[in-house]
Swiss-Prot record:
Job of this protein: Involved in the presentation of foreign antigens to the immune system.
TM stretches of this protein: 309-329
CDD domains in the record: IgC1_MHC_I_alpha3, TM_EGFR-like
Short name of any one Pfam family annotated for the protein: MHC_I
A GO term, aspect molecular function: signaling receptor binding
Protein known as: RLA class I histocompatibility antigen, alpha chain 11/11
Oligomeric and partner information: Heterodimer of an alpha chain and a beta chain (beta-2-microglobulin).
List of residues that carry Phosphoserine: S355, S358
Provenance organism: Oryctolagus cuniculus
Annotated segments matching region Alpha-1: 25-114
Disulfide bonds: C125-C188, C227-C283
Chief localisation class: membrane
Region (Alpha-3): 207-298
InterPro entries listed in its UniProt record: Ig-like_dom, Ig-like_dom_sf, Ig-like_fold, Ig/MHC_CS, Ig_C1-set, MHC_class-I_related, MHC_I-like_Ag-recog, MHC_I-like_Ag-recog_sf
Amino acid sequence: MGSMAPRTLLLLLAGALTLKDTQAGSHSMRYFYTSVSRPGLGEPRFIIVGYVDDTQFVRFDSDAASPRMEQRAPWMGQVEPEYWDQQTQIAKDTAQTFRVNLNTALRYYNQSAAGSHTFQTMFGCEVWADGRFFHGYRQYAYDGADYIALNEDLRSWTAADTAAQNTQRKWEAAGEAERHRAYLERECVEWLRRYLEMGKETLQRADPPKAHVTHHPASDREATLRCWALGFYPAEISLTWQRDGEDQTQDTELVETRPGGDGTFQKWAAVVVPSGEEQRYTCRVQHEGLPEPLTLTWEPPAQPTALIVGIVAGVLGVLLILGAVVAVVRRKKHSSDGKGGRYTPAAGGHRDQGSDDSLMP
């Protein structure tokens, strides 16, 4: 049997999204189904969210006033009206299937129905830039832990524990892997291609990151340099700190890429450096929207003392010029008074002598 798929299923009821790495130049479609039992409060709550690449495009919530599959991307307005009726019915049917799954899991794990439990699945497909299929996946989780997953070959299953082996035997006998493989390799790909065409202005764009480095003193001897990348799409990006040209991967604190709230993404990477050695560190930013990688360093702010010196020098220069003008005017004034005549300005000069008087001490 193949290895279990990564533990990426999260409780989407809280709106969390774990971004799944994809190959550069590829596209993906993913669906997340979550059913949460709530004893004494009626039917389990059932939620579906669908993503094309990093953009949510559909959502269903059984707790809505009128539960329907809903549009979450503007370009989904291009689909025919019956699409929403069909997807709503599929969602309602799946909600009932998941209700049964929750009850079955209670028996398999010998648990009481008094507590709340969660059953989830994530499935989807990925295609190359030219639309060719290259990867599919389907995995299930119970109470936040792996339950069973379709292997990489899309022909067999891996169960996480003895309880899940009951499901594995049942699905192997029913040929469930073959059914899912057919969907992932064909129907999933066809829909993904269609969505990519409808939303190409959004989904196939490449917004470059706005990047900069900030400086945060940690102590008298150390400081933290943080490299920021903001406003980029798609989500795939690389931030690498280097010291004298050598990667500092082991010493870098790197946060997960996260949504920026406006359809773009943000990320940062930080490294602690000795004070005074900041200029030896550079941040390298690579993203599909950049014509070439960015190389950034921390730019120290202008020193206040240097600014003050510059201002003082400028003021002194102005005073020297004014002093020279005053001296010239005084000499001309004294020269005119000595001859006992009146000073008459040359033709074309200033006719208002008041400006000269204002310069006198």
